């Protein structure tokens, strides 16, 4: 006997979260809970404003229609990426095919005063990998901050993300301030320039490895080995079903590329599932999931060690 529930939710964000020049005051999304006999599976559907093509309202309509079809015996997945991902997670939990083991290690997202960051990063146990957003300020400033961190902590490796913010000139201005002796400790720089060709040229000219992120979701993207390209960053909420995520990870690994499972600012429930997906598909790579602290609460499932208050399922709005 099948049953289902869909929950709508909204989490207040910390002040100062800006996506594509838009301040994000709340994170809005949906959960689907599927039940069959004694078994239960959950999934999160939370399109990311400015990045997802679909809106939260679009996703809700598609999800509710899919749930009705599933209750009637139809299991075909929807095409909309955020819905396909959430639904496939719920089905995988229901079928017990999403392993419970999780990788809760995070590459901490660094912002704020560089002196404070140095103290925090120097105390990190184990492999020191951190993420820095660049492209929000002047490229010269970004270069100086990155150089300072790499200089101060000799065993630190940085993942940088420019979100296609730079022209070729700005990319060169950034690189000019990063000591060539430290550049190999930049694990990769995600999408430095506005076009893929300019990003490839940046990698060739600077020796700084790059990673594809937004490019993976463009219709003309193909997985090929290229000089200077070291990694792909896979955001399942923007990608689609678990099968599609797994296909992309396998395609990257076949080329010797690092595949990084990354957050689209999901709630704690979605983040814990991403941690399980990372442990399953990319066990040797620290995922990019350090976004929970941007929110003011957790929901339904806790992220281990987080002090944020937990909102129970009973407090969420039911849609069925």
From Swiss-Prot:
Highest taxon of the lineage: Bacteria
Q: Please name the GO terms that the record assigns under molecular function.
A: magnesium ion binding; O-succinylbenzoate synthase activity
Q: Which GO biological process annotations does it have?
A: menaquinone biosynthetic process
Record carries keyword DNA repair:
no
Per the Swiss-Prot or TrEMBL record, the active site comprises: 133 (proton donor), 235 (proton acceptor)
Binding of Mg(2+), residues: 161, 190, 213
One Pfam family here: MR_MLE_C
Q: Which reaction does it catalyse?
A: (1R,6R)-6-hydroxy-2-succinyl-cyclohexa-2,4-diene-1-carboxylate = 2-succinylbenzoate + H2O
> Has UniProt tagged this entry with the keyword Cell membrane?
no
E.C. designation(s): 4.2.1.113
Name its pathway: Quinol/quinone metabolism; 1,4-dihydroxy-2-naphthoate biosynthesis; 1,4-dihydroxy-2-naphthoate from chorismate: step 4/7; Quinol/quinone metabolism; menaquinone biosynthesis
Q: What does this protein do?
A: Converts 2-succinyl-6-hydroxy-2,4-cyclohexadiene-1-carboxylate (SHCHC) to 2-succinylbenzoate (OSB).
Q: Which family does it belong to?
A: Belongs to the mandelate racemase/muconate lactonizing enzyme family. MenC type 1 subfamily.
| Listed name of the protein | o-succinylbenzoate synthase
What is the name of the gene encoding this protein? menC
């Amino acid at each position: 006997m099948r049953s289902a529930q869909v929950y709508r939710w909204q989490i207040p964000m910390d002040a100062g979260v800006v996506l594509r020049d838009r301040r994000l005051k709340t994170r809005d999304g949906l959960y689907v809970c599927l039940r069959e006999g004694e078994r239960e599976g959950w999934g999160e559907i939370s399109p990311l404003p400015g990045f997802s093509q679909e809106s939260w309202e679009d996703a809700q309509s598609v999800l509710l229609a899919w749930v009705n079809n599933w209750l009637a015996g139809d299991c075909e997945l929807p095409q909309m990426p955020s819905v396909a991902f959430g639904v496939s997670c719920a089905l995988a939990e229901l079928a017990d095919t999403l392993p419970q083991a999780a990788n809760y290690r995070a590459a901490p997202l660094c912002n704020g005063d560089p002196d404070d960051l140095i103290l925090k990063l120097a105390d990190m146990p184990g492999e020191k990998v951190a993420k820095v957003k660049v492209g929000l300020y002047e490229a010269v400033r970004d270069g100086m901050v990155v150089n300072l961190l790499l200089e101060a902590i000799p065993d630190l490796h940085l993942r940088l993300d420019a979100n296609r913010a730079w022209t070729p000139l700005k990319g060169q201005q950034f690189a000019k301030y990063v000591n060539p002796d430290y550049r190999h400790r930049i694990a990769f720089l995600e999408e430095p320039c506005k076009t893929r060709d300019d990003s490839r040229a940046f990698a060739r000219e600077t020796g700084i490895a790059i990673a594809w992120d937004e490019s993976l979701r463009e219709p003309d993207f193909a997985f090929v080995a290229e000089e200077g390209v070291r990694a792909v960053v896979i955001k399942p909420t923007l990608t689609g079903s678990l099968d599609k995520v797994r296909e992309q990870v396998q395609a990257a690994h076949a080329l010797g590329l690092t595949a990084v499972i990354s957050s689209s600012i999901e709630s704690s429930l979605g983040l814990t599932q991403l941690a399980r997906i990372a442990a399953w598909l990319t066990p040797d790579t620290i995922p990019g999931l350090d976004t929970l602290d941007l929110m003011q609460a957790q929901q339904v499932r806790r992220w281990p060690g987080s002090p944020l208050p937990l909102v129970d399922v009973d407090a969420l709005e039911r849609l069925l």
